[in-house]
Swiss-Prot record:
Keywords: ATP-binding, DNA damage, DNA recombination, DNA repair, DNA replication, Nucleotide-binding. It comes from the Viruses. One of its GO terms (molecular function) is ATP binding. Coiled coil: none annotated. This is Recombination and repair protein. It comes from Enterobacteria phage T6 (Bacteriophage T6).
Length: 16
């Protein structure tokens, strides 16, 4: 897991 991956997940969950 990398910072970019976590950021992507957070954005996806935020926009969900």
């Amino acid at each position: 897991m990398s910072i970019a991956d976590l950021k992507s997940r957070l954005i996806k969950a935020s926009t969900s």
